[in-house]
Structures are given as C-alpha cells and as structure tokens.
C-alpha cells in the first residue's frame, strides 16, 4: 500500500513539473520573439527593401524559429516587420525593454497570451517612450510555435511612430 501511494505521489509530482515546464517554454518562445522584434540589433545589416525576395528570407532567418508559416505570412502581409524595422532603424538604440504578461487563457489546442511591451527609443538628444500591446496564440503542437500575432493598432506606439 505504501509503495502504491509513493508511486502515485511521484507520478503526480512528475506530471506537475512537466506541465509547468511546457507552459514556461511557450512563454519563453513568445518573450524571445518580442525581444527580437523590438531589439535594435535585430535590424542591423538588413538588406534593402528593393531586394524584396532577399528581405523576406532575411526576416524569415531572424523570426522563423518562433512562428508558423501562416503567422509569418500574416505578419509580412501586414508589414509588421517593416514597420518595426523602419522605426527602430531610425533610432540610435532601444533601451529599457520591459515585457509584462497581462493575460493567459488556455484554449483547445492553443494558449492565448496578451502582453504589454514598453521600451525606449533613443533618438539624437531625445528619448521616446514606447508601449505596444500584443496578443499571441501559441500552439500546443509544432514545438510551441506562435500561430497568431496581433498588435493593437489603436493603442500601440509603433504605429504612431511609423506614421511620423
């Protein structure tokens, strides 16, 4: 009887650890994607926009490990990468990146995360405070890749800075 109880407790603890680690991996994937998206170093040595085919491959090599093909294609179609590239490349640096998870919802087959991302753009002699609001669907399969990315355009600073 004692062996059975010990075995059951060991199984429960093991399952708890595995579930906790897998959820952590999903969050790490999203947060790594966000850091790369807003990082100044990401856009160094980018090919020019005139070389469209090469530019797509360049973005894919930088962000492809985090995204499914559909998510990558949608971000390209919405010009999200080019907007971040234009705004961040115009700055002399990005500092104080702060990523805050504001929501997590478990759904059938994926987890929905929402984040508030704040950072500072350094320009000439000024600092611009940026706040972007992002939502992600992360698949339970496919190595925890991001299936969907939404950036709220009414409240996110990146769109206001891009229009300037």
Regions from the language model: what does each represent?
Residues 1-8:
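Bacterial N-terminal signal peptides that target proteins for export
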Residues 9, 25-37, 105-109, 113-121, ...:
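N-terminal hydrophobic signal/anchor transmembrane helix of membrane proteins
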Residues 17-20:
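C-terminal motif of bacterial Sec signal peptides marking the signal peptidase cleavage site
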Residues 23-86:
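Core segments of small alpha/beta cavity-forming domains
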Residues 41-45, 117-123, 138-142:
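Beta-strand elements of well-folded, non-transmembrane domains
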Residues 85-124:
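Surface-exposed, charged secondary-structure patches
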Residues 127-145:
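A short, surface-exposed beta-strand/turn
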Residues 145-164:
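Low-complexity, intrinsically disordered terminal/linker segments enriched in charged
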């Amino acid at each position: 009887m004692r062996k059975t109880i010990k075995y059951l407790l060991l199984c429960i603890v093991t399952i708890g650890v595995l579930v906790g680690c897998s959820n952590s991996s999903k969050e790490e994937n999203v947060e790594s994607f966000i850091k790369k998206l807003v990082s100044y170093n990401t856009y160094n040595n980018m090919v020019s926009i005139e070389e469209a085919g090469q530019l797509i491959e360049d973005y894919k090599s930088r962000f492809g490990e985090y995204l499914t093909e559909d998510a990558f294609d949608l971000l390209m179609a919405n010009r999200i990468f080019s907007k971040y590239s234009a705004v961040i490349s115009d700055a002399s640096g990005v500092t104080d990146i702060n990523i805050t998870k504001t929501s997590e919802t478990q759904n059938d087959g994926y987890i929905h995360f929402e984040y508030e991302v704040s950072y500072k753009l350094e320009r000439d002699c000024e600092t611009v405070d940026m706040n972007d609001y992002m939502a992600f669907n992360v698949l339970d399969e496919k190595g925890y890749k991001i299936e969907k990315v939404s950036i709220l355009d009414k409240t996110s600073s990146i769109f206001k800075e891009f229009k300037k």
